[in-house]
From Swiss-Prot:
Residues 138-143, 194-221 are extracellular. Residues 18-45 are annotated as: Disordered. Residues 42-76 are annotated as: Interaction with ITCH. A motif (PPxY motif 2) lies at residues 64-67. The keyword Ubl conjugation applies. Residues 2-41 are annotated as: Interaction with UBE2L3. This is NEDD4 family-interacting protein 1. Residues 2-116, 165-172 are cytoplasmic. It is a multi-pass membrane protein.
């Protein structure tokens, strides 16, 4: 019995020392592995990033805009003001004086008129004299109507000059004043020709200016 206890006491220190040695080896290996798996320090990453971005700047790549510039949007009022300024012509009031190449459509035909309006105002001014002239000239807005009124009034003036000159109801009215008779006669003839010739020119305007990009239209009555 004593021998067994002595042998057991001799074996226990040997086992304890061997177990202690293995435990020390494992503890010494764990710090080495933890040191190998640890991330690099932040300072080294910052230095590498700075070097990379310096290389990007030196290579000529454009810098991205700042956050304030990229996220700043115009307000609704500013956007509407910019849109309104973009639609304002550089020279205001000039487009109204011009008619485009392809703009001789129905609207311009209403401004120019047709032969029916010309003949209507012509006979109104011819039959009703100055009353018909003023009515036809003021009530019509087309070139045909106004030129017809001018032409009809000129022919009406010639008619009344001839009536007064050769009528027996006005004896001696132009005695000694034949120059005045010729003045009114020539004036009426010029008015008649002016209205007729100008209307003929206006009718040919769509064909004459069809090849021009911009055409200024001005009616002088």
């Amino acid at each position: 019995m004593a021998l067994a206890l002595a042998a057991l006491a001799a074996v226990e220190p040997a086992c304890g020392s061997r177990y202690q040695q293995l435990q020390n080896e494992e503890e010494s290996g764990e710090p080495e592995q933890a040191a190998g798996d640890a991330p690099p320090p932040y300072s080294s990453i910052s230095a590498e990033s700075a070097a990379y971005f310096d290389y990007k700047d030196e290579s000529g790549f454009p810098k991205p805009p700042s956050y304030n510039v990229a996220t700043t949007l115009p307000s609704y009022d500013e956007a509407e003001r910019t849109k309104a300024e973009a639609t304002i012509p550089l020279v205001p009031g000039r487009d109204e004086d011009f008619v485009g190449r392809d703009d001789f459509d129905d609207a311009d035909q209403l401004r120019i008129g047709n032969d029916g309006i010309f003949m209507l105002t012509f006979f109104m001014a011819f039959l009703f004299n100055w009353i018909g002239f003023f009515l036809s000239f003021c009530l019509t807005t087309s070139a045909a109507g106004r030129y017809g009124a001018i032409s009809g009034f000129g022919l009406s003036l010639i008619k009344w000059i001839l009536i007064v000159r050769f009528s027996t109801y006005f004896p001696g009215y132009f005695d000694g004043q034949y120059w005045l008779w010729w003045v009114f006669l020539v004036l009426g003839f010029l008015l008649f020709l002016r209205g007729f010739i100008n209307y003929a020119k206006v009718r040919k305007m769509p064909e004459t200016f069809s090849n021009l990009p911009r055409t200024r239209v001005l009616f002088i009555y």
